[in-house]
Amino acid sequence: MHTTDRFAPIRALMMTDVYKLGHIEQYRLAGTPEIVYSNWTNRGSRIDGVDHVVHFGLQAFLIKLGDWFAPFFAADEDLVCELYEERLAQILGPNTIGSDHIRALHRKGYLPLSFSGVEEGTPVPVRVPSFVFWNTDAEFFWLTNYIETTVSAEIWQPSTSATIARELRRVLDEGAVRTGSDPAAVDWQGHDFSFRGMSSVETAAASGAGHL
């Protein structure tokens, strides 16, 4: 889709918590790390009797992540650095963080990150990681938690919807057995009618996929 947004090449770099723009220098206050690990761990449940969360949404997120950063890697190196510094100046003031690490990432040509997790659809106990991710090049230690913001924003909805749907399916299946009802009717009883109540089409798609 055509866009007139001249900041489009760095849009993905702005999809983070603002303090993480300075993570590279914050980490260095304690030395220079090589590998930074992060994890996705559901810390608790708000549903009585539910102590597992269905892992779902990571594969879709990784595809999106690649799409988001494609304009960055396709753009001119000097342009992305100029745009990044211009945007930083608008947010934090001039000459704050710099763009050398952004230039290095552009020259790398891809996101040096690795993800490892359980199979999608697996119920994972609360307080146990569903997946972990880390930087595969020591120079980009800052990148792991830089993208953690989008990880959180993209994963919680589909995994939560999948968890709720799993619990509802259990209740409906048990009810069908207890009342002697046709088990095939459960597929209709548990259909997803949430689209109209979602915040966006994208949210509805993520939630609907989790429900299925």
Language-model region placement:
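Low-complexity, highly charged intrinsically disordered N-terminal segments
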Residues: V36-I97
